[in-house]
Amino acid sequence: MATSTTGSTLLQPLSNAVRLPVDQVNFVVCQLFALLAAIWFRTYLHSSKTSPFIRHVVATLLGLYLALFCFGWYALHFVIQSGISYYLMIIIGVENMHKYCFVFALGYLTVCQITRVYIFDYGQYSADFSGPMMIITQKITSLAFEIHDGMFRKNEDLTPSQRCLAVRRMPSLLEYLSYNCNFMGILAGPLCSYKDYITFIEGRSYQLQQSEANGKEDTKYEQTDPSPNIAVAQKLLICGLSLLFHMTITKTLPVEYNIDENFRATASWPVRVFYLYLSLMAARPKYYFAWTLADAINNAAGFGFRGYDKNGVTRWDLISNLRIQQIESSTSFKMFLDNWNIQTALWLKRVCYERATFSPTIQTFILSAIWHGVYPGYYLTFLTGVLMTLAARAIRNNIRHYFVESPAVKLCYDIITWMTTQVAISYTVVPFVLLSVKPSFTFYSSCYFCLHIASILVLLVFPLKRTQKGNKQHESIQPVWSKKLEEENLLQKNSYSTTNNSFSQKEEITCRYQALKQ
C-alpha cells in the first residue's frame, strides 16, 4: 500500500489517524470539497445568475486546483494532453483529426502508465495521476469523433446515436479545458458527452415530449430546474455504506489470501470457492464509493438530470457509472458487464466497435485492455473474460429456453446462474487485483484452470448461434458494448444540440423523445 504522494502532504496527520495512504485521503477530501463546491456552484453561479464564460472559468480553475492538490506537478499532464490534442484538432482539420487525437491521447496515456508502473511505483494500488488521464483520454477521443461526425460526415451516414451526439462547431479552448478538467469530473469522472456538458453549463431549457394516455405525442416545452437534493442524499448514503464496508470488512477479506500457500493446502474446495466470492465481492465497494460520489458531485452541481419517467419522477442517472443492485444480482456475465463501468462501455462502443471495419469484437477488447493500463494482470483478466463471455453466451442461447416456462423451474435456474456468474466473475478478475503474472498464474494453477477448461469444453459442445438481427459485417460473437445501442439512447437522452445551428429544433426534440420512450 502506498505511503507517499506526489501531491500535498497537508493531510498527513489525518492519513496517519485513519491508517490510509495520504494520496487516498487527498482524493476523498478533495471529492468532498468538490461536493461542497458543486452545491455552491449550483446556488451562486447558476446559469440564470451568471454567464457561461464565468461558469467555464470557475469550473476549470477549481478542477486544476484539485488536481494540483492531489497529484502535484503530475497534474500538468492533464493540461499538456488536453492542450496538444486541441492543437491537433485545429491544425489537422475535421476530416482526420479524430484519428490523430485518438492515437496521440491513447499513446500519451500509455506512456504515462508505463513510466508510473515500471519506473516509479509498481504495484501501488492507490490514487495516481493516470486515473484522471484515463477519463480525459475518453473525453478527448469522444469529442474528436463527435466533431468529425458533426462537421465532416454527412447526416445520412450517421447512426441515430451519432446524429444525437454530433458536435457542429469547434469548441473554444476554454470550453475544451472546462469539459476535460472541470472540478466535478477531474478526479473520478465519469465520462459525459460534450453536448450534455455544454447544455448544463449554458443552462439550456429542456424540451420534453411525453406521451399522453391515449398514445398521442404531446410536446411540452418546460423551463425546468428540478432539485437534485434527494438523488444526492441517496447517493451519499450509498457512499457512506460503501466506505464503511471498505474500512471494516474489506480489510479482513484480502484477495491475496486466495493464493496463500497454507490456505490452498488446508482449505476444502467449497471453502476456497466461497472465500473467492467473498473476497472479490468485498473488493467492489471502493469502486461503488468512488463512482457514486463522483455521480453525486455532478448531480449536486445540477448536472446529470435525465428527465422524467412516465410517472413524472425526476431521474438523475444520465452519467451514472454503475447499478449496484443489478451487479450484485447478476445472473449472467452480460448482465454484470452491462451494469459495471457503464460510461466506459459506451465509450468503447462509440469510438471503436461501431466504427471498426473488421473484427470489431477483437478491436474493442484490445482497446479496452490498452486503456486500462499496462499491468499484466489486466490482460489476463480480459483474455479470460473473452472466454467466459463466449461460453456464457453459448450456454444461455442453447439451454435457457428450457427453463423459462415454469416459474418454479425458472427460479431454480436463476439461482444456479447467479451462483455460477458470481463465481465466474470472481475467478476472472483475480488477476485484475493481483496485477502481476506470477501470483495470477499461481491462483489459476491452484484451481487447475478449471473454468478456462470448462469454457473451452462448452464452446466445443454448444454452437454459438448467430444473431438474427446482426449486420452481416459484424461477427456473430458480439461483446456487451455492441448490445448497448438502445441503452445508449436511454442514457444519453439529454444529448440534444446546444452548438448546432443547422440541426433543427424539431430533429432534436425527436431525438430526445425517442430516448424517453425506451
UniProtKB/Swiss-Prot annotation:
Segments crossing the lipid bilayer: 21-41, 60-80, 87-107, 183-203, 230-250, 267-283, 365-385, 415-435, 443-463
Keyword Nucleus: no
Enzyme Commission identifier(s): 2.3.1.-, 2.3.1.51, 2.3.1.23, 2.3.1.n7
Bridged cysteine pairs (disulfide): none
Pfam families from the UniProt entry: MBOAT (PF03062)
Subcellular location: Endoplasmic reticulum membrane
One term under GO cellular component: endoplasmic reticulum membrane
Keywords associated with the record: Acyltransferase, Endoplasmic reticulum, Lipid biosynthesis, Lipid metabolism, Membrane, Phospholipid biosynthesis, Phospholipid metabolism, Transferase, Transmembrane, Transmembrane helix
Record-annotated active site: N341, H372
Mode of membrane association: Multi-pass membrane protein
GO MF term set: 1-acylglycerol-3-phosphate O-acyltransferase activity; 1-acylglycerophosphocholine O-acyltransferase activity; 1-acylglycerophosphoethanolamine O-acyltransferase activity; 1-acylglycerophosphoserine O-acyltransferase activity; acyltransferase activity
UniProt-listed GO biological process terms: lipid modification; phosphatidylcholine acyl-chain remodeling; phosphatidylethanolamine acyl-chain remodeling; phosphatidylserine acyl-chain remodeling; phospholipid biosynthetic process; regulation of chondrocyte differentiation
Reaction(s) the record says it catalyses: a 1-acyl-sn-glycero-3-phosphocholine + an acyl-CoA = a 1,2-diacyl-sn-glycero-3-phosphocholine + CoA; a 1-acyl-sn-glycero-3-phosphoethanolamine + an acyl-CoA = a 1,2-diacyl-sn-glycero-3-phosphoethanolamine + CoA; a 1-acyl-sn-glycero-3-phosphate + an acyl-CoA = a 1,2-diacyl-sn-glycero-3-phosphate + CoA; (9Z)-hexadecenoyl-CoA + 1-hexadecanoyl-sn-glycero-3-phosphocholine = 1-hexadecanoyl-2-(9Z-hexadecenoyl)-sn-glycero-3-phosphocholine + CoA
InterPro entries found in the cross-reference section: LPLAT_7/PORCN-like (IPR049941), MBOAT_fam (IPR004299)
Pathway the protein acts in: Lipid metabolism; phospholipid metabolism
Family: Belongs to the membrane-bound acyltransferase family.
Function: Acyltransferase which catalyzes the transfer of an acyl group from an acyl-CoA to a lysophospholipid leading to the production of a phospholipid and participates in the reacylation step of the phospholipid remodeling pathway also known as the Lands cycle. May catalyze preferentially the acylation of lysophosphatidylethanolamine (1-acyl-sn-glycero-3-phosphoethanolamine or LPE) and lysophosphatidic acid (LPA) and to a lesser extend lysophosphatidylcholine (LPC) and lysophosphatidylserine (LPS). Prefers oleoyl-CoA as the acyl donor.
Full protein name: Membrane-bound glycerophospholipid O-acyltransferase 2
Source organism of this protein record: Gallus gallus
Gene transcribed to yield this protein: mboat2
